[in-house]
Structure formats: C-alpha cells, structure tokens
Amino acid sequence: MIVIPAVDMKNGKCVQLIQGDPNKKHVELENPVEVAEKWVSEGAEMLHLVDLDGAIEGESVNRELIKEIIQTVNVPVQIGGGISVRCTESNLIEIGAKRIILGTVAVENPDIVEEISKKVGKEKVMVALDAKDGKVVIKGWKEKTKYTPVEMGKILEEKGAGSILFTNVNVEGLLTGMNVEPVETLVEELEIPVIASGGVTTIEDLIKLKAVGVEGVVVGSAIYKNLIDLKEAIKACR
C-alpha cells in the first residue's frame, strides 16, 4: 500500500483545512514546491496535489504551480480541484500528471468519465467520492446526493473510471481517526482500486486500511502536524 502525502494549494500557499473550510486552517506554508520536495525526500513515491482555488472557481487556477511541482519532483502526481472542463484534463495530462481526479462533474454526469477515459486512458482517470452520513456529497460537500458510495462507485466503474478516491467527510481534517468500515465495503464491492482519504491520524489507521485492501492512502494534516512520521508510515505499509 502506498502512502501519498497531500499538497493542497490555496492562494499560492500550501494549506491544510479543517472540514474543507477555507476559513479554518491547520497549516499554512509559503512554498508548495518546497513542501513537495520535502515529502519526496522523506520517501514519498507519489504526491496528491489539490488546487483548492480551482475547486472554488471551477477551473484549474494554480496550473503553473502544479507544473513547477511536477517538473521539480521525480515521482508521479495525481491532481484534483477544479477539473470540470474537458480542455483542463488534457492540459494536466500534458504537463505530466499521472492521474487526474474528477469530482462533482463526474457524479452529476457519469458519461463525462467515459468520454475522458477514452480520450486520455482509463488508468489516468480517478473519481473522488466524498461521503457524509453514508451518502455521496458534491459541490464542496455542501450538497448531498441520493447515492451511497457503493452505488455511485459501480456506476463510475462501469463508465470507465480507473480508480476511486474515497473521502469520509465526517472525519476529514479533524485528526480524530479513521472509520475503516465504509472503505472496506467499497473495496469489496468494486473491481477498480480504491485510495482512501480523510481522518488518518496514526500509523495504526494506515495498517488497518492496508488490511482491508486499499491501494493507497492520502495523508494530510497528520503529517503536517507531526502526528505521523512519513518515513515510518511508508515503512509500516510496505
């Protein structure tokens, strides 16, 4: 199982938010490129980049910063935030993204997943499923859908998603620990790989996730707040 550090960008800085609220930050660091280099120097084999400005604006805003990180580090990156128009997917793949992460746009219109998968390759298309109280939520976690993660996951899998990024919104950014059960259910029900995110606080959380068969785990606040040592986490998950 791969441990994937998150580098979330807002206004050109690296931040970690509480419950996705731009007004509530655990962390704010000046240079996202230096942060990315730090995690790679500690053994990260992949990075998770999120353009938070893009998520709000609906299109990729920090594209040049993302490009600089990709050119600077020597590991694959997956990119999310504001990927809602077709030209953006191609642009991000062209600048070197291993995977692009589709969110609300894919849940609202799963046919887009099929279209983009045919265009750039299934393996490059990840869809983010954010769940709150057992239902998929969209539009910055503000709107609840009628679908469970498994129901939507199966639709997206059929449409050509190459992988799923599952976030438990109930625990995201709170540093309260991981709820493994919904992740395990998703892994059991889907054929495509699942990456978990949200609430990881200890290496024990990571070991539990490895046991249920996730391909990887995105870690954010816990490594920025020094609750988890990245080197030790990577070692424990090999």
Curated annotation (Swiss-Prot):
Q: Which GO terms describe its molecular function?
A: 1-(5-phosphoribosyl)-5-[(5-phosphoribosylamino)methylideneamino]imidazole-4-carboxamide isomerase activity
Q: Which domain of life is it from?
A: Archaea
Q: Which InterPro entries match?
A: Aldolase_TIM, His_biosynth, HisA_bact_arch, Isoase_HisA-like, Isoase_HisA-like_bact, RibuloseP-bd_barrel
- The chain's disulfide connectivity reads none
Q: Which GO terms describe its biological process?
A: L-histidine biosynthetic process; L-tryptophan biosynthetic process
Question: Where, by residue number, is the active site?
Answer: D8, D130
Q: Which GO terms describe its cellular component?
A: cytoplasm
Keywords, comma-separated and alphabetical:
Amino-acid biosynthesis, Cytoplasm, Histidine biosynthesis, Isomerase
Recorded hits in Pfam families, A to Z, give:
His_biosynth
Query: Which pathway does the record list?
Result: Amino-acid biosynthesis; L-histidine biosynthesis; L-histidine from 5-phospho-alpha-D-ribose 1-diphosphate: step 4/9
Q: What is its EC number?
A: 5.3.1.16
What class does this enzyme belong to in the EC scheme?
isomerase
The UniProt entry's sequence similarity note says: Belongs to the HisA/HisF family.
NCBIfam families (alphabetical): 1-(5-phosphoribosyl)-5-[(5-phosphoribosylamino)methylideneamino]imidazole-4-carboxamide isomerase (TIGR00007), PRK13585.1 (NF010112)
The name this protein carries in UniProt is 1-(5-phosphoribosyl)-5-[(5-phosphoribosylamino)methylideneamino] imidazole-4-carboxamide isomerase
Native organism is: Methanothermococcus thermolithotrophicus
Starting at the broadest rank, the lineage of the source organism is: Archaea, Methanobacteriati, Methanobacteriota, Methanomada group, Methanococci
